[in-house]
From Swiss-Prot:
Family: Belongs to the amino acid/polyamine transporter 2 family.
Expression sites by tissue: Expressed exclusively in neurons and not in astrocytes and glia cells. Highly expressed in the synapse. Highly expressed in glutamatergic neurons. Primarily expressed in excitatory neurons, with some minor expression in inhibitory neurons.
Swiss-Prot/TrEMBL keywords: Acetylation, Amino-acid transport, Cell membrane, Disulfide bond, Membrane, Phosphoprotein, Synapse, Transmembrane, Transmembrane helix, Transport
Protein name: Solute carrier family 38 member 6
Pfam families found in the cross-reference section: Aa_trans
Topological relation to the membrane, as annotated: Multi-pass membrane protein
Transmembrane spans: 48-68, 70-90, 112-132, 171-191, 192-212, 251-271, 289-309, 328-348, 372-392, 395-415, 432-452
Tagged with keyword DNA-binding: no
Location(s), subcellular: Cell membrane; Synapse
Source organism per UniProt: Mus musculus
Function: Amino acid transporter with an apparent selectivity for L-glutamine and L-glutamate. May facilitate glutamine uptake in excitatory neurons. The transport mechanism remains to be elucidated.
Entry-annotated residues carrying N-acetylmethionine: M1
UniProt key word Cell membrane: yes
Lineage: superkingdom: Eukaryota
Amino acid sequence: MQASRHSIQAEPGWYVSAQQPEEAVAADEWSPLLSNEPHRQGSSGASFGLSVFNVMNAIMGSGILGLAYVMANTGILGFSFLLLFVALLASYSVHLLLAMCIHTAVTSYEDLGLFAFGLPGKVVVAGTIIIQNIGAMSSYLLIIKTELPAAISEFLPSDHSGSWYLDGQMLLIIICVGIVFPLSLLPKIGFLGYTSSLSFFFMVFFALVVVIKKWAVPCPVTLDCINEVFQISNATDDCKPKLFHFSKESVYAIPTMAFSFLCHTSVLPIYCELQSPSKKRMQNVTNTAIALSFLVYFVSALFGYLTFYDKVESELLQGYSKYLPHDVIVMAVKLCILFAVLLTAPLIHFPARKALMMILFSNYPFSWIRHSLTTAALNAIIVVLAIYVPDIRNVFGVVGASTSTCLIFVFPGLFYLKLSREDFLSWKKLGALFLLLTGAVVGSFSLVLIIFDWVNK
């Protein structure tokens, strides 16, 4: 059985039919990506828990702030179905990626593209990863730029307008130089496991505060509700939750959710540093991370929507800034969510830098100078984008509709159909085809509608 497994890894294709089905499944579940991984025999490598935190940190970023707005434009049941649907598809696409990596003996998303379609496939995948992750990091830093000055000013006893520490652009540059850049310079993604755990607990605290503050804002929502606490919501038409709803704004639903569940570019680097790595163990890491992220997403979106209903902002924190500007708990949770978003940026930076260096310097040995210069260049790009992109929804919609849907749905399905030698009517190939078609339809349709909406405005 061991020899059979290595023969599969050595071939430039899939030869699953050479094994009995039950033997192939057993090999898939416990096969490592590489037959020679020294760290598997020792105690080095990231633990299961830290790996879960890293995957959750890759999943949970600024997307959590836009989901209440999505629920307001799709309804509670509509949102629940769509969120569950995208989460299941995200988990299944990771399953396909891990299966392909086992049978092709490659360790990166870009190399899967190379294995399937040659050099053009590698370049397309790497370019998609770079664009998507730059868009994600820009949206994270955009939140820092817009929200951090207001969060700081709320703790100040008097007016300090004009001060450098209330200048969003200045704070953004300082944070990128002092925090994001040093963390991004770390050579291994596993080093960020502890900062990822801190980021996740900040997100959980945010969700709990959203639940508690549902009763702090009376309904109907008016500016007179400032400083009111624990008011009972009135049963008016404005305060009745919608189970299903569709409007022009609903077009942002799927792209925003796809953006919120994207962890695929970080899964393989995290897998390579996992203790006792196997396909089954990494799938369990991913499923645990997606399930916990789904829970936090749903709770924060539901109670955020039930707080503001149709008046919910596209960025949830803006609503609390407007109606509860001096609430101490809200002031604290703003800083927590900002730090959580900030700590996500370095994790997303790793796949972007790796993709860029695989395109430009794939034949060169590792160099700290090249590593540092590439990191600095990427940080400079995302700072510029964060300064000049005015609306976070633009980032969510366009990036989610184009690159995120490719990385979650299109590429895993397409590569599996290309590389697998299973019968076309097998369940996995049909699932891969469904994944591919879903991504192509959803991504194209959403992108067209978003552009059409912009033109009308």
